[in-house]
C-alpha cells in the first residue's frame, strides 16, 4: 500500500529553488509541471527569496522560450532591471515569434523606456495599442506609458492628452 501525496506548488518550488541548476531541473519536470505557471512563479519567487534573482530570470526566460505565459512575462519584467539591454534583446527575440502580442510589445516599450530609448518605446507602445481590441481594458495602461514617453520627450501637451485618455478609460 502506497499513499503518495503530491506536493503543492509552493513546497515543490521551495525544493526546486535549492537546486544549483534550475534549467536542468526544469527540463526534468513532467510536461504538466513545465506548463504550470503557478509552480514556475512560486519557484522564481523562491529563488528571489534566496537572493538568486539572476537564476530566477534565467528560469523564467527558459520557461517563456518553452511555453508562453503572460503571467511569467510580467514576473520576468520585474527582474529585467539588472541588465536592461540584455533584457531588451531577449524580449525582442520573443517578439520575432510573437509580433502581435500586445503585452509583449508593452514590455518592449517599458524596457526601451527604462533604457532611455524614447522613440523605440513610443513605437512599441503605439504598436501594442494597434494590437488591442477597441474595448480592451489594457489600453488605459498603454496610454499611461505613452504619456510618460511624451513627458520624457518634453512634449507636455501630448503627454497630457495621453494621460487624460488613460484616466478616461480607467474610470469607465
Where do the PLM segments sit?
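Repeat-based scaffolding regions
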Residues: 1-172
Amino acid at each position: 500500500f502506497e499513499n503518495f501525496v503530491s506536493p503543492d506548488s509552493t513546497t515543490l518550488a521551495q525544493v526546486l529553488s535549492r537546486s544549483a541548476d534550475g534549467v536542468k531541473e526544469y527540463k526534468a519536470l513532467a510536461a504538466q509541471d513545465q506548463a504550470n505557471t503557478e509552480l514556475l512563479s512560486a519557484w522564481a519567487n523562491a529563488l528571489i527569496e534566496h537572493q538568486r534573482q539572476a537564476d530566477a530570470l534565467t528560469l523564467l526566460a527558459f520557461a517563456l522560450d518553452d511555453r508562453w505565459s503572460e503571467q511569467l512575462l510580467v514576473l520576468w519584467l520585474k527582474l529585467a532591471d539588472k541588465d536592461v539591454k540584455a533584457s531588451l534583446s531577449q524580449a525582442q527575440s520573443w517578439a520575432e515569434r510573437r509580433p502581435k502580442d500586445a503585452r509583449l510589445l508593452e514590455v518592449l516599450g517599458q524596457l526601451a523606456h527604462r533604457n532611455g530609448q524614447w522613440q523605440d518605446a513610443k513605437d512599441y507602445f503605439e504598436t501594442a495599442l494597434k494590437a488591442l481590441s477597441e474595448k480592451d481594458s489594457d489600453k488605459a495602461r498603454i496610454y499611461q506609458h505613452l504619456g510618460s514617453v511624451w513627458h520624457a520627450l518634453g512634449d507636455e501637451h501630448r503627454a497630457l492628452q495621453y494621460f487624460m485618455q488613460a484616466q478616461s478609460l480607467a474610470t469607465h
